[in-house]
Amino acid sequence: MSAAWIPALGLGVCLLLLPGPAGSEGAAPIAITCFTRGLDIRKEKADVLCPGGCPLEEFSVYGNIVYASVSSICGAAVHRGVISNSGGPVRVYSLPGRENYSSVDANGIQSQMLSRWSASFTVTKGKSSTQEATGQAVSTAHPPTGKRLKKTPEKKTGNKDCKADIAFLIDGSFNIGQRRFNLQKNFVGKVALMLGIGTEGPHVGLVQASEHPKIEFYLKNFTSAKDVLFAIKEVGFRGGNSNTGKALKHTAQKFFTVDAGVRKGIPKVVVVFIDGWPSDDIEEAGIVAREFGVNVFIVSVAKPIPEELGMVQDVTFVDKAVCRNNGFFSYHMPNWFGTTKYVKPLVQKLCTHEQMMCSKTCYNSVNIAFLIDGSSSVGDSNFRLMLEFVSNIAKTFEISDIGAKIAAVQFTYDQRTEFSFTDYSTKENVLAVIRNIRYMSGGTATGDAISFTVRNVFGPIRESPNKNFLVIVTDGQSYDDVQGPAAAAHDAGITIFSVGVAWAPLDDLKDMASKPKESHAFFTREFTGLEPIVSDVIRGICRDFLESQQ
């Protein structure tokens, strides 16, 4: 049975008739955080336990008695007088959405107004209180406020399951106009509310695209939804051409910096709002954003009508600007009216960490060169096993023109570049070329081969933002010195993994490998033993990559 409002004639108050106890009445209350929201509770009725010492000034509470579901449950409970700031049990009842959530100052918390929200909740004392009788009516008159509770300096942690650094790039052009610009801000505010902004959750900033882009506020400026909402509300309409491409490039290059609050290891996201179509080239800006490891989402509103298509530079601009043209990064709304239903699906996308394919990871931000022993002692059949080993490592990585890059050199006394980092930009092509490498046969000069690879393979891409790795596979002792060339490679920022088979001396493997030697040098007696080493090398590459990002 859902909760219902009934009037109490002559009393000047309304009564909220709450449903009676369900079969799970004996269950212990669920422990929640200070900032668990009503929308996080999926039941019609739930008993929860609020912690003590929550920072009152950072509670986000919308409404009075009936609260928008984006409100903090514990904040609403303190606001209503159900508990004090020392915490305690609270019963939460889900209610339908409504309009006109009012703003009331009570018990040290100033709740905020909200014109409309899709779901609501109310709170009463928890199961230990005397209000357990079935169908008991609870008065909605204001509880005595008493003394204002003391504020604490603690910070809101936010939604830890939605870690992202997000820039909202809003349309501030004459194309959208003042009225739709305000509707756009309202939508962005709703998205920001639902994200669960906090110190350990998502951080957001705002950029306005117009004649010239303007960064309205950075990631580091606000870490609570309340402050972000106020900042969005204060953003003024600029006008001018939309110049979305110019603004996107500016955002990718200038917004996501350490000084501006970007966090290492957290996905960087730009949500671009386009009302109609951009007035400049957005494809190049999308490429720049991907090169900087930024995940670009496009929210397009009001597609051009057939008579306007001639004014659009490129009707496929969305596909060319997003992180990946797979449907995940593009989002369309028919207009700026009735957009509430589009908020949650967009938030779910922004909080799906594993889908952020343009973020820099060990799988898409490395250059890996393979130095393959083609000496006579290997033999053709074993050489094929070495190529299979190389392929199994290479196919793990996200190879593309802006992602991971693979190169291969075969050596005996001589060296032969089988393919360089810039020759192939798809995984299919790279694997096909590896399969077709021809066995050279000859002596073993590993030191010269290392120097050759550093100079001719890594040299041309020295400006690459990717981390460089060299995987050496050899079956015997080198006729020349390996320690000096390997040290030079290390000094050039190249991490070396050495993999030895059969007669390869352990001393040579350690001399070539990066530190710590035990996790960068591997040995197997048989060529068939190379397969288990594949996962060791991949884990090592990812470990070294992550350490370099700290």
Curated annotation (Swiss-Prot):
Disulfide bridge partners, by residue number: C34-C50, C54-C74
Listed result of changing V66G: In DFNA9; affects protein deposition to the extracellular matrix
Broad class of where this protein is predominantly found: secreted
Listed Polar residues bias regions: 128-139
Post-translational modification, as annotated: N-glycosylated. A 50 kDa form is created by proteolytic cleavage.
Keywords, comma-separated and alphabetical: Deafness, Disease variant, Disulfide bond, Extracellular matrix, Glycoprotein, Hearing, Non-syndromic deafness, Repeat, Secreted, Signal
GO cellular component assignments: collagen-containing extracellular matrix; extracellular region
SUPFAM superfamilies: LCCL domain (SSF69848), vWA-like (SSF53300)
Localization per Swiss-Prot or TrEMBL: Secreted, Extracellular space, Extracellular matrix
Effect upon mutating F527C: In DFNA9; induces disulfide bond dimer formation; keeps dimer in the cell and reduces secretion; monomeric and/or homodimeric mutant forms do not prevent interaction with type II collagen
Boundaries of every VWFA domain copy: 165-346, 367-537
Repeat found in the keyword field: yes
Keyword Iron: no
Subunit structure: Monomer. May form homodimer. Interacts with type II collagen. Interacts with SLC44A2. Interacts with ANXA2.
Role: Plays a role in the control of cell shape and motility in the trabecular meshwork.
Protein name (Swiss-Prot/TrEMBL): Cochlin
Taxonomic path: Eukaryota, Metazoa, Chordata, Craniata, Vertebrata
